[in-house]
Amino acid sequence: MKAPFDFVIEPKGNRYNNTKKVGDKDLILNTEVFNHQFVNREAIVKSVPTAYNTKIKPGDTVIVHHNVFRRWLDVKGREKNSKSYFNENTYLVKPDQIFLYKRQCDWLAMDGYCFVQPIKQRNSLDVETEEQCIGIVKYTDGINKTGELVGFTPFSTYEFIIDGKRLYRVMNKFITIKYEYQGDEEAYNPSWAQSS
């Protein structure tokens, strides 16, 4: 199946990532359909749009918007699928719903985005565990360099768990400063974000 303007994708695994392996048992973390934090965001590309060229190829793994696989309840309490839904294993998504793609072993950001890993709090008197609005560029579209220490505007991030690491998706236009490394910066990844 091909679409003229949409990517055709299928979820990698289930629609929701709401279980965690504890020993030989599965622990259910969430049973609500409306909580976006437990929606699967990884997908496999089945086909690319036919109307234009794209960097993404069939077979690539992509990170998509949290509403793509999400189910929700309408005003009458009926469960509905997202507007991307075609059938249980097929979804149609627009290019602006894809933020990151993986070819072979490398993650690459879509144009206009980069993914930033937060750093640990350097001030021992601060109660926060991570520095606010500062991080290390992990994946980029080429505008910023991987490994750069950058600052970004407040409320401009969106949290993702990618390969067991918590990262923030930041639009390039919201990166406001590039810092020099001081040598005491350390990436921060909370234990709950790590893969089991």
Spans of model-derived segments:
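Acidic-enriched and Gly/Ser
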Residues: 1-196
